A protein has these predicted regions:
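Conserved N-terminal entry element of GNAT/NAT acetyltransferase domains
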Residues: 1-11, 143-150
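Short glycine/proline-centered loop/turn elements that form peptide/ligand docking sites
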Residues: 88, 92, 111-114, 131-137
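Acetyl-CoA-dependent GNAT
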Residues: 7-81, 92-96
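Short hydrophobic/aromatic beta-strand or adjacent loop that forms the aromatic wall/cage
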Residues: 48, 134-141
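Conserved acetyl-CoA-binding loop-helix of GNAT-fold acetyltransferases
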Residues: 84-97, 116-120
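Active-site acidic-Proline motif in GNAT/NAT acetyltransferases
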Residues: 79-85, 109-110
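Conserved GNAT acetyl-CoA-binding A-motif
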Residues: 98-110
Length: 150
């Protein structure tokens, strides 16, 4: 599968909303399904740079939203059918300044698959804390250099 990453445009928003809602319900299974709403996407990504990953047919396979002033990865979601196909790594590699820019993110400890993915991508835990919906590292940071992506 060839993955193309590009900046999202207004026409992508409906598909991104659906992926965001579906992925959160699948990922955060301990939360009631009605805790998540389609409109959450608009609120949680406001002002962020959105990059979309598409497969060979132009179908959305995943997206990342970044708060650029702080190099903070706010959301990175990959469609379940595309897990372990390089979509997440492609989204990271396509981030501005990658791999030299040091990006940060937060991830719940209960989200073991995501933590494993970020560790495999050379992110390291730099703190821990609590969140409304569970215990989480307060921050995870990408190590420099990212030899894995050279």
């Amino acid at each position: 599968m060839t993955i193309t990453v590009r900046d999202a445009v207004a026409g992508d928003v409906p598909v991104l909303r659906e992926l965001f809602l579906r992925s959160r319900r699948e990922t955060f299974f301990w939360q009631p399904g009605d805790a998540f709403r389609l409109t959450d996407f608009d609120v949680q990504t406001k002002g962020e740079r959105l990059r979309i990953a598409e497969d060979d047919s132009g179908r959305c396979a995943g997206f990342v939203s970044v708060w650029e002033p702080d190099h903070f990865i706010h959301h990175l979601y990959v469609d379940r059918s595309d897990h372990r196909r390089g979509v997440g790594r492609a989204l990271l590699r396509a981030m501005p300044g990658w791999p030299a820019t040091r990006y940060r993110l937060k991830c719940l400890r209960a989200n073991e698959a995501a933590l494993a993915f970020y560790r495999a991508c050379r992110f390291t835990e730099i703190g821990a804390g609590a969140a409304e919906d569970g215990e989480c590292p307060s921050s995870i940071s990408a190590s420099v250099p990212h030899a894995l992506f050279a």
